[in-house]
Amino acid sequence: MSRIPSINSTSAYESSVPQFGRRSGPVALLLPLSGPFAPVGRSMEQAAKLAFAASGAPPLDVRNTQGTPEGAAGAAQAAISAGDGLILGPLTASAAEAVGPIAHAANVNVLAFSNDENIAKPGLWPLGISPGQQVRRVIAAAAASGKTRTAAILPRSPFGQLMGTALRKEAKRLGETAPQIGFYDPSSFASLTRTVRSITNFDARGAGLEARIRAARDQDDEAGRLLAAKLALEPIPPPPFDTLLLAAHGETLAEIATLLPYYDVGPPQVQIVGPMLWAREAQAMATHQALVGGLYAAPPPALRGAFVQKFESVYGTKPPAIDDLAFDAAAIAVLAAHEGGYTTRVLTNPTGFFGTDGVLVLQPNGKVRRGLAVFRVKPGGPQLVAPAPHELPPDIVPAR
């Protein structure tokens, strides 16, 4: 973890940010070390301890949340009573929301491991790579290539809702027409089929061509028959969008891949885009012609190489991706301890940090900006379309 060198003065920034947070003390690490998520918590604990092995690191106070909001609240209260100056974790959004008010009342900042941007507030930063961050990056990439009319086919789930909300916001920010969004029941293929048919406006598109063919046949002469035959060879008009956001993966994505050609949706008229989850499925996706060329935003895999190597050398196994958050949060804590403490001014310096998954900037309002790369699904493996930025332009948002 390192600071990104700044070429801009930050004096105006520093005067606008409240000096919230403690300057010193041990760092609390709140994780589910018992219950169903204990294996996740134990692995994240190992990742955090790697960062705290650095020379001059503050003491690390590991506490068990028991995998519940109530347990997280109790762990936070105990950590604060013990004099801890910063909280890393907890894992989930509900647990982080339980910890937030307790920490804020005690003048303690929180770096949570959730990826839900909705819980962000001054003093509480969700560090996970959020659906919103992914959508903003990939929709902007599509817009840069001239695709500006968006639509989405999303599961009726919390993840789908977050993707839909992010798409609406990004389309508005780019000055695009409000997107058409269809939600389907993830457990029903019939619901999925209806949603695809509706969003693609297939009935109207196909009906118009069919009506012209029938009218030609109704002429009941040679000219009409020739026209009908010619019209039958014409493609169905394109759908009313040129960018289609999908949130599905696995079997559901494969099902969508069979439906899209049937409803005449695909390249070059339509750019398919999707979530970071596609990074681990890109090669399988490339076996479906409808998905070849699809775009997704994700951290460059090579960036986490040093962390993976360090983790594997110490623990003898490869770390799951979620461990990146624990390592980066811990590294930020160690760096902040050397730079003046765990205050909002230190944590939200607009130069940001360069971590395991690339550049990230914590903002005073609790939002987190990330620099993600954009990849294209190709038969030979994912193709880098737009590299991840090494720094993000200033975008100072005041605390509210």
Give, region by region, the residue ranges found by the protein language model:
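Extracytosolic ligand-binding ectodomains
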Residues: M1-R400
